[in-house]
Structures are given as C-alpha cells and as structure tokens.
Amino acid sequence: MVILGVDPGLAIVGYALIEKQGNKYRVIDYGSINTPSKLESVDRLKIIHTDMVNIINKYNPDQMAVEKLFFNKNVKTAIEVGQARGVILLAGSQARLKIYEYTPLQVKQAVAGYGRAHKSQVQRMVKALLNLNEIPKPDDVADALAISICHGNSYRLNRKWGTKG
C-alpha cells in the first residue's frame, strides 16, 4: 500500500510517499511545496493544487492521509491552513483516493507512543522507523512522514478490528 501523507500549509506543504508492506515501511519520496509570500492567496492555492495533482499522478498512491486542522489562536493562520487543506483534499478527491484525516495528537501517539510528545521526539522516531540518515527538513516534511506512518499503523489496526479510520 502506497500512502501519501500531507502536512498542509499555505507557505509550505510537506508531503511524503511511503510504501507499507506488513510491518515495514519504505520511503518512496518526500519533499515540500513552497509558495512565495508575495503572491496572492488564490495564486498560492493554485500552486498547491497543481503540484499536489502532479505528485498524485506521478506516484499513484493508494490512500491519502492529511493532518486535521486544529484550533489555532491565530485566526488568519487557521484560515490559510484550512484553505490549503481544501485544495489538497480536492486534489485527492479528484484522483478518487480514499482520504483519512488525523489530529496532531493522533499522529504523535501513533509515531512516538505519547500524544503530547515534543516535535523533536516525533522527528527522531520518524528517522528511526524509516531508517533515514537524518531528520528531514523542513519540519513540514518530517510531519508529513509522521502522518504517513500514523496512517499505516492506524489503517492496519482499523482493518483488523473493523473500526472506521
């Protein structure tokens, strides 16, 4: 199963493609979609959508896992992330991908074993679980890898116990 994990944002979208076979993960690719701050929001969203469609077409993932929007004290940031999530979800839906969403707490729990783990703890676990030489940068990319791992673990358990992801 090939999983496309996405950490949404307007400035930087982290993405990661991993293959899960049994209890093992293999990294296919990861990176970021960066949008220039000088552009209007609508143009930045267009870049995100176009690039996400291209990534989906290139790698043909089986499923998509996206971080859920959590309440942010900065309303402007929350709106921008929500808009980015919208075009990301649209790209996945247009490709007829099964889309799963996970909260930051669920991702931390699945990857580090503790829902309140610090970002650095999650990043070290991502590095270890995927046998990477270093923690991927920027943080958004490491987060996308963590989201992919979270889905791989959660999907396996949900299939076993018949619960909804």
Curated annotation (Swiss-Prot):
Catalytic activity: Endonucleolytic cleavage at a junction such as a reciprocal single-stranded crossover between two homologous DNA duplexes (Holliday junction)
Keyword entries, A-Z: Cytoplasm, DNA damage, DNA recombination, DNA repair, DNA-binding, Endonuclease, Hydrolase, Magnesium, Metal-binding, Nuclease
Cofactor binding remark: Binds 2 Mg(2+) ion per subunit.
Annotated binding of Mg(2+) 1, by residue: D7, D140
One of the GO biological process terms: DNA repair
Family annotation (CDD domains): RuvC (cd16962)
Keyword Nuclease part of the UniProt annotation: yes
Family matches, as InterPro entries: RNaseH-like_sf, RNaseH_sf, X-over_junc_endoDNase_Mg_BS, X-over_junc_endoDNase_RuvC
Keyword Protein biosynthesis among UniProt keywords: no
Leader sequence residues: none
Binding site for Mg(2+) 2: E67
One Gene Ontology term, aspect cellular component: Holliday junction resolvase complex
Subunit structure, as described in the record: Homodimer which binds Holliday junction (HJ) DNA. The HJ becomes 2-fold symmetrical on binding to RuvC with unstacked arms; it has a different conformation from HJ DNA in complex with RuvA. In the full resolvosome a probable DNA-RuvA(4)-RuvB(12)-RuvC(2) complex forms which resolves the HJ.
Family under the similarity heading: Belongs to the RuvC family.
Protein name per the record: Crossover junction endodeoxyribonuclease RuvC
Organism: Halothermothrix orenii (strain H 168 / OCM 544 / DSM 9562)
Gene designation: ruvC
